Amino acid sequence: MKKYNLSQIMKNAWNNFHQSEKSFSECLHEAWVMAKMLVLGRLWEKYGKRRVYFNQATLLNLCGVEVDSYKSGHVSHCAVNGERASHSDGEYWLDGTDGCYYDLITGKFSKNASLYGASRRSKFDDVVSAIKNFVRI
């Protein structure tokens, strides 16, 4: 189990509390959400944007998905919660977790453009619900 830096979480909550008009409990909740999101990914701040980009392998593990691939990149094995799944499902999971991020300014989950286009079924919604369940948003 990941141990969190409680001192840093409390400092972030107090800084947010002093800079905004939110209650301290709201600021503390936001600080915990941020700490849990940083376990899954990394913070990126540039060009007036603040985003948490999630690690694909960590997201697949969080969703209970195991995907192996050939050297060419094609899926060789996919299992969801220990049960064998189709190779196309593996592609959908890889597509749904690739380039997934949370925009801290807008408060929305998003992802980089899909390799397969918008028409292809993706597991992005399942990934977002797993993240929300983990960080308790």
Where are these regions (language model features)?
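Charged, low-complexity intrinsically disordered segments and flexible loops
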Residues: 1-137
